[in-house]
């Protein structure tokens, strides 16, 4: 969702609460739970999963390895669920012509730096930089170059923009900010 007027441009950034993250967190949780149940049933010698008899899988070495994969998968799954619940990476970019200030806000991981808030004067913006990495899967990226601060990415690496869409976005933003576009 984006909102734009003559003086203010607000771009809402989607964080980790994406459909693909929910899908992979569920698949990883269920798969690792299955591995852990198979490893546990081979250790106990009982059928915790009725798909096949537990005597077919010896605990050493297959049961140990499956238990290890199950535990590792549960840790990775819990990490994914935590990033989804904390909505890491979400936030907004706000360009305010009236105040002459650019605000960039992102949610991070819990702790001292949970809120990432950057503020710049519009007059310090040197250019909007667009980089296109050629290859089998070309990925355009958009950056804002700030005097004395370097470049700040404005697009995520997992966003699937075509070069044409990225050019359009870069042109609109550069026009709004009244700065040049650099293409690399």
Swiss-Prot record:
Topology in membrane: Multi-pass membrane protein
Source species of the chain: Ceratophyllum demersum (Rigid hornwort)
Sorted UniProt keywords: Chloroplast, Membrane, Photosynthesis, Plastid, Thylakoid, Transmembrane, Transmembrane helix
A cellular component term, taken from the record's GO annotations: chloroplast thylakoid membrane
PANTHER family referenced in this protein's UniProt entry, alphabetically: PHOTOSYSTEM I ASSEMBLY PROTEIN YCF4 (PTHR33288:SF4), PTHR33288
Keyword Chloroplast set for record: yes
Main localization (coarse): plastid
Name of the protein in its database record: Photosystem I assembly protein Ycf4
Gene Ontology biological-process annotations: photosynthesis
Function: Seems to be required for the assembly of the photosystem I complex.
Upper classification of the organism: Eukaryota, Viridiplantae, Streptophyta, Embryophyta, Tracheophyta
Tree of life domain: Eukaryota
Membrane-traversing stretches: 22-42, 57-77
HAMAP family: Ycf4
Subcellular location: Plastid, Chloroplast thylakoid membrane
Family that this chain belongs to: Belongs to the Ycf4 family.
Gene: ycf4
